[in-house]
A protein has these predicted regions:
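N-terminal Rossmann-like NAD(P)+-binding subdomain of aldehyde/semialdehyde dehydrogenases
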Residues: 1-121
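Conserved C-terminal structural/oligomerization subdomain of aldehyde/semialdehyde dehydrogenase
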Residues: 18-24, 341, 348-479
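Residue-level signal for inorganic ion chemistry
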Residues: 19, 55, 157, 189, ...
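Short, well-ordered beta-strand elements within core beta-sheets of diverse protein domains
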Residues: 22-28, 42-49, 135, 242-244, ...
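Structural signal for hydrophobic packing residues in well-ordered secondary-structure cores
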Residues: 44, 48, 63-73, 80, ...
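Rossmann-like NAD(P) dinucleotide-binding subdomain of oxidoreductase/dehydrogenase enzymes
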Residues: 112-252, 378
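A short hydrophobic/small-residue beta-strand
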Residues: 159-161, 334, 418
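ALDH superfamily catalytic-core signature
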Residues: 217-358, 421, 471-472, 477-479
């Protein structure tokens, strides 16, 4: 028994709008995690034997409980300092269940035997779900990103344990109450609370794990997964570029880039964090972008007004500030915003457009995770592609051009798992296409498309011999 089990631990959480440590929770003990996983294993077999339509029906019952729980919405609002995005996170549950049900029907449909290379042998595949899947969620979209892994895992027939981020823990308690309203689901889905130590205990007990977070922590998670000999599906950081060609409309491009850079205060891994614009339209583009950036307002003091919320994690404010200061010290020009603002105890930053940047600056090389938009000009499209690929990240990217054909000709050369053409950040709302994570932006099977569910199965093959006479021992030997 560990010291944690004997004494227990309590963690405090900061309110992003007030800056106050106004919430605390007791960490789930390691022994409790072992008990939870054991209970889930006992319930998983019956869950996996249900049809996918039956599992979807149970999940839809949960969605109704979630949508009617005002305490859950209020807790998520307090966790993130955002009202409209919190509302959207909760609303996404119902549509996500429907989306995965459609995909699941294709996976689970009856398949006839397939002729093998041997004339008398056919085969068919069987999908066996992992018994217990673990999920370690992030703080930027604490409910939504958890759902992206949780729903397909449950639909596949796995039981699931979720550890949300300790930065945004308030929503866990009311969410657990909604699970209790659907006992069948509560038997195969549980939430635990804690920090990195808790995450390690989770990895030690599950059969597969999904992680969303930083590259640094992701590497530790992957190492631990290897030691436990379980698959890890990790989506890590990003430094997404957009290339704007000379034939693009500078005004429309500015609108797209601003939205993709500052939505959710830039606290999204697929936010645009680097802009490469052709020199012939750069001035017009920057003029439009700055004008739009200066029109963005904070949702303070009224959370239901304004465009962007506070910085959820106070340490992220320090990173953003260091990136801006580093750029200024190296000769960059701040065209809008440029500082961390304190309002009511919370930390906020208005859209910060930065010109005269290069790849010696942190703001062009490291993940900023805030509404900071560094703009770099180029003269040759091959130079733009080289710059876009000059990064340790490869999550996603975008190309804005005169038409989609021109954009596609550029996109195929970008080293990233998903490239939006004639838009930015399409993967924030479209999950149909499969993508992998390039470079240090992640590892493991895609969380999108059919593979988003298939990754929770082990594939089994059944071979059937149809020959009337099978080979006996007389067929052996060296004759």
């Amino acid at each position: 028994m560990t010291n944690q089990d004997l004494q227990g631990r309590t963690i405090q959480a900061r309110n992003p709008r007030t800056g106050e440590m106004d919430y605390s929770f007791e960490v789930t003990k390691n022994s409790e995690i072992e008990e939870i996983v054991s209970d889930l294993r006992s319930s998983q077999k019956a869950w996996s034997e249900k049809t996918i339509d039956q599992r979807a029906e149970t999940l839809n019952d949960w969605a109704k409980a979630v949508s009617s729980n005002e305490a859950l919405l209020e807790a998520l609002v307090q966790d993130t300092g955002r009202y409209f995005i919190a509302t959207a996170e909760i609303a996404r549950l119902t549509t996500m269940i429907g989306d995965w049900l459609t995909i699941g029907h294709e996976i689970f449909k009856d398949q006839p035997g397939i002729q093998s290379s041997a004339p008398t042998v056919t085969y068919q595949h069987q999908y066996k779900p992992f018994e217990v899947v673990g999920i370690i969620g992030p703080w930027n979209f604490p409910f939504l990103i958890t759902l992206i892994d949780l729903i397909p895992a449950l639909m596949a027939g796995s039981a699931v344990v979720v550890k949300p981020s300790e930065i945004t823990p308030r929503f866990i308690q009311p969410l657990q109450e909604t699970l209790k309203q659907v006992p069948e689901l509560n038997g195969v889905c549980r939430f635990i609370q804690g920090d990195g130590e808790t995450g390690q205990a989770l990895i030690n007990n599950v059969d597969a794990l999904c992680f969303t977070g930083s590259v640094k922590t992701g590497k530790l998670v992957y190492k631990s997964g290897a030691e436990n000999f379980i698959p890890i599906y990790a989506e890590l950081g990003g430094k997404d570029p957009v290339i704007i060609t000379e034939n693009a409309d500078p005004k429309e491009s500015a609108k797209i880039v601003l939205r993709a850079s500052v939505q959710a205060t830039g606290q999204a891994c697929q936010s645009i964090e680097r802009v490469y614009v052709h020199e012939s339209i750069a001035d017009n583009f920057k003029t439009e972008l700055v004008q739009l950036a200066k029109a963005v307002t904070l949702n303070y003091p009224n959370i239901r007004e304004g465009h962007i919320g506070p910085l959820i994690f106070d340490k992220q404010a320090d990173i953003i500030e260091s990136h801006i200061n580093d750029a200024k010290e190296k000769g960059a020009e701040i065209l809008s915003g440029g500082s961390i603002e304190n309002h009511g105890g919370g930390k906020w930053v208005l859209p910060t457009v930065i010109g005269n940047v290069d790849h010696s600056m942190l703001v062009m090389m490291e993940e900023t995770f805030g509404p900071v938009i560094p703009v770099m000009t180029y003269s040759d499209i091959n130079e733009a592609i080289r710059l876009a690929n000059d990064t340790k990240y490869g999550l996603s990217a975008a190309v804005l051009a005169g038409d989609s054909q021109e954009a596609e000709s550029v996109a195929k050369h970008i080293d990233a798992g998903a490239v939006s053409i004639q838009d930015c950040g399409i993967t924030t709302y479209v999950f149909d296409g499969e993508k992998n994570w390039f470079k240090e932006s992640g590892i493991g099977a895609s969380r999108m498309g059919e593979m988003g569910m298939l990754r929770f199965f082990r594939k089994k093959v059944l071979y059937t011999q149809s020959a009337s006479e099978n080979y006996g021992i007389d067929a052996m030997g060296e004759r």
